[in-house]
Curated annotation (Swiss-Prot):
Source organism (scientific name): Amphidinium carterae (Dinoflagellate)
Catalysed reaction, written as an equation: 2 a plastoquinone + 4 hnu + 2 H2O = 2 a plastoquinol + O2
Record-listed chlorophyll a PD1 binding positions: 194
UniProt family annotation: Belongs to the reaction center PufL/M/PsbA/D family.
Domain of life: Eukaryota
Record text on subunit structure and interactions: PSII is composed of 1 copy each of membrane proteins PsbA, PsbB, PsbC, PsbD, PsbE, PsbF, PsbH, PsbI, PsbJ, PsbK, PsbL, PsbM, PsbT, PsbX, PsbY, PsbZ, Psb30/Ycf12, at least 3 peripheral proteins of the oxygen-evolving complex and a large number of cofactors. It forms dimeric complexes.
Function noted in UniProt: Photosystem II (PSII) is a light-driven water:plastoquinone oxidoreductase that uses light energy to abstract electrons from H(2)O, generating O(2) and a proton gradient subsequently used for ATP formation. It consists of a core antenna complex that captures photons, and an electron transfer chain that converts photonic excitation into a charge separation. The D1/D2 (PsbA/PsbD) reaction center heterodimer binds P680, the primary electron donor of PSII as well as several subsequent electron acceptors.
Location(s) in or outside the cell: Plastid, Chloroplast thylakoid membrane
Record site feature (Tyrosine radical intermediate), residues: 157
Keyword Magnesium: yes
Protein name: Photosystem II protein D1
């Protein structure tokens, strides 16, 4: 009898977890997603408001990132783990106590690891839900792009640089600081993978705007002139709500014939694939720069036949990068040897 009750309870639990008719699909991955993301969110908000200063450079000069220490929404951040910790896994039980753990930036690892595992679980949940509904798996494939970007910035880059102190701070100003320092140290703007990523993101935005405007401009009129065109659409209707042939004809004549799609499926696959592939490539670029396979640099000035310098924008960019690098961790640098 007891085993029967347990069997029924387990069956009811499985039915609740895997049912695709729930208002919010949970799924087996959801059992990981919701606790992990909840812990990451609570820890992040708490640290953003209340965390003490962190010895990010490992030189006993802690940096404060919380609001209680005078920061605002722009300058506030969860400061990365101390350089003294390096790439060691640093849970609370590896420290002598909570004060030491906070001083060495253990909160950063806590938030990053829980967040990253949570969003990976979210990707798995997307696949699981698609599988339950008999859908194709492209939603979870598309979501792998931001997952790859998060892995590159929060996991691979700190490991490649030898310390989680090189990870991106979890704040607005910290993000921009990370971007500037990344350019100074790795010349990311001159890396071909970053260039392809920019083409992917901005190209995806352009294509999305073009597609949306074309569809909105070629809606099939199902209503009277005094009514909104939106009232002519019924959710779940079998008929198309716009004329793809009209949109194709317009765009083909606006630019040239083969710049336009005449197949709705290939069009939407292209709209999904272009930015996803671009972000994949950028993530790969950040992962390679993590191990100092950098973009093109201008460390050598241009010389004429007599050996005199020829001033160029390359020198300006190089000096700007050096200046940014000096300002970054200014007390940890040994000027000018660090610029060699």
């Amino acid at each position: 009898m007891t085993s029967l009750i347990r069997s029924n309870s387990w069956g009811s639990f499985v039915q609740t977890i895997t049912s695709s008719s729930n208002r919010l699909y949970i799924g087996w991955f959801g059992l990981l997603v919701f606790p992990l993301l909840s812990l990451a969110t609570v820890a992040y908000i708490t640290a953003f408001f209340l965390a003490p200063a962190v010895d990010i450079d490992g030189i006993r000069e802690p940096v404060a990132g919380s609001l209680i220490y005078g920061n605002n929404i722009i300058s506030g951040a969860v400061i990365p783990s101390s350089n003294a910790i390096g790439v060691h896994f640093y849970p609370l039980w590896e420290s002598l106590g909570l004060d030491e753990w906070l001083y060495n930036g253990g909160t950063y690892q806590f938030v990053v690891f829980h967040f990253f595992l949570g969003v990976c679980g979210w990707m798995g949940r997307e696949w699981e839900f698609s599988y339950r509904l008999g859908m194709r798996p492209w939603i979870f494939v598309a979501f792998s792009a931001p997952i790859a970007a998060a892995a590159a910035v929060f996991i691979i880059y700190p490991i490649g640089q030898g310390s989680f102190s090189d990870g991106m701070p979890l704040g607005i100003q910290g993000t921009f600081n990370f971007m500037l320092v990344f350019q100074a140290e790795h010349k990311i703007l001159m890396h071909p993978f970053h260039i392809l990523g920019v083409a992917g993101v901005f190209g995806g935005s352009l294509f999305s705007a073009m597609h949306g405007s074309l569809v909105s401009s070629s809606l099939l009129a199902e209503t009277a002139g005094s009514e909104s065109l939106n009232n002519g659409y019924v959710f779940g209707q079998e008929d198309e709500t716009y004329s793809i042939s009209a949109a194709h004809a317009y765009f083909g004549r606006l630019i040239f014939q083969y710049a336009s799609f005449n197949n709705s499926r290939s069009l939407h696959f292209f709209l999904a694939a272009w930015p996803v592939i671009g972000i994949w490539i950028t993530s790969l670029g950040v992962a390679t720069m993590a191990f100092n396979l950098n973009g093109f640099n201008f460390n050598q000035s241009i010389l004429d036949e007599s050996g005199h310098y020829i001033n160029s924008w390359a020198d300006i960019l190089n000096r700007a990068d050096l200046g940014i690098e000096v300002m970054h961790e200014r007390n940890a640098h040994n000027f000018p040897l660090d610029l060699a």
